[in-house]
Amino acid sequence: MRRTKLRFLWLSLATFVFPLWAQDSHPSCNKCSGTYIASDEIQAYLNRSPRDAVVTDQQVRAVDVGKSNVDIGVVYRNKTAGGAVAEHDLVSEVYHVIDGSATLVVGWDITDLKRRPADDRAVRLLNGPGGNGASIRNGATYQLKPGDVVIIPAGVGHWFTKIDDHISYLMVRIDPDKVTPPKDEAASKADLAGAGR
């Protein structure tokens, strides 16, 4: 009886478990290179942000990493007592606050949501299809300061309800559907030289 159980166990392992160990896993971005962005380049984008603009959202890189794009942006927002809610259908965002402070509300229950047109700059170049709304019901409120990080999944509204003086942040956009166009170092340098304005 005991031998029968042991044989059954080994047969089960040989049939189901061992083949799993033998499977090769392959990277989703075979032989891709890493991407480096110097702090001087980030600072150059921040320095060219007009201080009289309500918001300046600039794409620094958009990199194909296999099954997804990962984009890096720099955003500068001026003092305001509110603005529109933003929502992106396909692109998630991660904010890392560099400077300044603000109140950010995040949530999925967006009032008076209206779609952005397909030819909108943000839709074409930054974060794909989405919409803007009037407010967020029952959202989470965060008091952002330098060093803070916020993760905003695709489809979730985000709304700066108050910016004390200004806020600047590095943004990582996760774009699994590759809706944003690629932007490499050469394109970034051309952008900074004035060709992308």
Which residues are covered by each model-predicted region?
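Conserved metal-binding segment of the jelly-roll/cupin
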Residues: 142-163
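Short, conserved beta-strand element in jelly-roll/cupin
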Residues: 89-108, 119-132
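Bacterial N-terminal signal peptides
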Residues: 8-20
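Short, surface-exposed beta-strand-loop junctions and turns on beta-sheet-rich folds
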Residues: 110-112, 166-167
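A short, N-terminal "cap"/entry segment at the start of jelly-roll beta-barrel domains
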Residues: 20-90, 182-197
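N-terminal secretory signal peptides that target proteins for export/translocation
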Residues: 1-6
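Short, solvent-exposed loop/turn positions at domain surfaces
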Residues: 91, 138-139, 146
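A short hydrophobic beta-strand segment most commonly corresponding to one strand
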Residues: 165-181
